[in-house]
Amino acid sequence: MAFTFPPSYRTLVGLYYIFTLMHTAVSTPPDDPVKCVSGNTNCTVTNSYGAFPDRSTCRAANVAYPKTEAELVSVVAAATQAGRKMRVTTRYSHSITKLVCTDGTEGLFISTKFLNHTVQADATAMTMTVESGMTLRQLIVEAAKVGLALPYAPYWWGLTVGGMMGTGAHGSSLWGKGSAVHDYVTEIRMVSPGSVNEGFAKIRILSETTTPNEFNAAKVSLGVLGVISQVTFELQPMFKRSLTYTMRNDSDFEDQAVTFGKKHEFADFIWLPSQGKVVYRRDDRVAVNTSGNGLFDFLPFRSQLSAAIAIIRTSEETQERFRDANGKCVGATIISSTLFAPSYGLTNNGIIFTGYPVVGSQNRMMSSGSCLDSLQDGLITACAWDSRIKGEFFHQTTLSVPLTQVKSFISDIKSLVKIEQKSLCGLELHYGILMRYVTSSPAYLGKETEALDFDITYYRAKDPLTPRLYEDFIEEIEQIALFKYNALPHWGKNRNLAFDGVIRKYNNAPAFLKVKDSYDPKGLFSSEWTDQILGIKGNASIVKDGCALEGLCICSKDAHCAPAKGYLCRPGKVYKEARVCTRVDGIISVI
């Protein structure tokens, strides 16, 4: 398909990304997710995007900021004695789902913001013990100081150790123990509610050798077992990576996706289905003495000019308002080519990109997020999704499809694109479908099998009752993955519908719940949301008029969509069992 590029739009997007390439240092760091009316009382918490999937406001009577494990024990003990509900919050709060929320208004937020220190680094044993509030960026830096490296991790370094453990965060690999951070942990110190004789709080020391059952429950805990205080990582000697991006057509992608991860240790893909293209990441481990001082400073994670971000968001809103699919496809083509040309932010020496392969040390290549690493500038610049500006606002559907089903799943998506080639340009405006490899994990709530994780980011309206252009196509993809191929949702991402009945997909769920009942019999660290996703009480879906528009439910009648705006509940186009909000011609002419 050939698109005509409007000069004004081309210039706008081009200037935006030229600025991004040049601008790497000055930015306003994200706000604290916890806000209180007076001191540390009468508080609310949100995520870094400023809205949870159901757009609710999460409240608590107080927030505590312990600075040591002893202070953490005191906080948990006092709340346990008082029978108060507790949830843990982090410095940046990047989980989309409501994992930070406690019930009602009388609960307690426990922030790990100041629990961010290295406890011990042992270069000989190749282990490092850190506090749970340490960010991934800090962990990478501290490990490198003693010549060590974490082999696999998420690409965004603004996550905390506790946050990664709580949600099962991962990078991309089928090699070794796989790409999940929690599978490179050897010991966890956790503070849980205790009995009267224990002073109402108990420090639990968990490891794969001494307490394997409890350890496997705590590795991905959703925060319902207590507060992780410290984590000990099993690290590796520093190594280098050699990375090359290649863009190809997607004609044989179904087959390549199944085998590519066995050939390259850190392989991943960025799929652009409406363009019929795939960006292959050929990324392999090389010896530490290999020449090269490369750096990966991912362009979308750099600081952005707030005014430019606002213009881009306004443009996307206008395209939605006037159903301008061509405009979205033009923008997607420009953005994907503009990101690919400078290698997504790779440089051969930390300054410029001169060509492939880019070789650099693991600590310089594995993760980035320079928009966090900055001074205050009055929001002239910010991370692109900062909720204080008119920036990116999106849904994120992130699902791990078993590797044995990936070929069929990709074929189904291609079948949808054949029906309407423009249907997925909107997600390509958000860089395309990121696909990362994961393996089975001994963690009870970790991945069940080798899989490919499909990370799909797409437009979200500020008005929850506003339908999206071609939303039925993305809804069908979501339901194909979840129900036809039994995909697992990422615990920290996704819309509500992904979590109904999800606990039945985990073979070790009963073992996890048994540990939960032992550690916190009164459910003080549980919430309505965790009870729903763990299958204890209620459902994650919220059924009401318009609920399917934001993934709060799967539509079963027209009222769950937007009938007044021409969107009715209809079967899927490829997967007939799907129920999606489809715009029906003749109902209404414009949104």
Swiss-Prot record:
Under the heading PANTHER family, the entry gives:
GULONOLACTONE OXIDASE (PTHR13878), L-GULONOLACTONE OXIDASE 2 (PTHR13878:SF159)
Leading EC class: oxidoreductase
GO CC annotation: membrane
SUPFAM superfamilies from the UniProt entry: FAD-binding/transporter-associated domain-like
Q: What does this protein do?
A: Catalyzes the oxidation of L-gulono-1,4-lactone to ascorbic acid. L-gulono-1,4-lactone is oxidized to hydrogen peroxide and L-xylo-hexulonolactone which spontaneously isomerizes to L-ascorbate.
Q: List the disulfide bonds.
A: none
Which family does the record claim for this protein?
Belongs to the oxygen-dependent FAD-linked oxidoreductase family.
**Pathway membership, UniProt:** Cofactor biosynthesis; L-ascorbate biosynthesis
Catalytic activity reported: L-gulono-1,4-lactone + O2 = L-ascorbate + H2O2 + H(+)
Please provide, alphabetically and separated by semicolons, the GO molecular function terms listed in this UniProt record: D-arabinono-1,4-lactone oxidase activity; FAD binding; L-gulonolactone oxidase activity
The record's section on Pfam families has:
ALO, FAD_binding_4, GULLO2-like_3rd
For this protein, the record's Gene3D superfamilies field holds: 3.30.465.10, 3.30.70.2520, Uridine Diphospho-n-acetylenolpyruvylglucosamine Reductase, domain 2
Enzyme Commission number(s) of this protein: 1.1.3.8
Cofactor(s) demanded? FAD
Q: What InterPro entries is this protein classified in?
A: ALO_C, FAD-bd_PCMH, FAD-bd_PCMH-like_sf, FAD-bd_PCMH_sub1, FAD-bd_PCMH_sub2, FAD-linked_Oxidoreductases_BP, GULLO2-like_C, GULO_Plant
According to UniProt, the name of this protein is L-gulonolactone oxidase 2
Alphabetically list the UniProt keywords: Ascorbate biosynthesis, FAD, Flavoprotein, Oxidoreductase, Signal
Which parts of the chain span the membrane according to its record? none
Instruction: Name what induces it.
Output: Up-regulated by methyl jasmonate.
**Which positions carry the signal peptide feature in this UniProt record?**
1-27
Start and end residues of each FAD-binding PCMH-type domain: 56-238
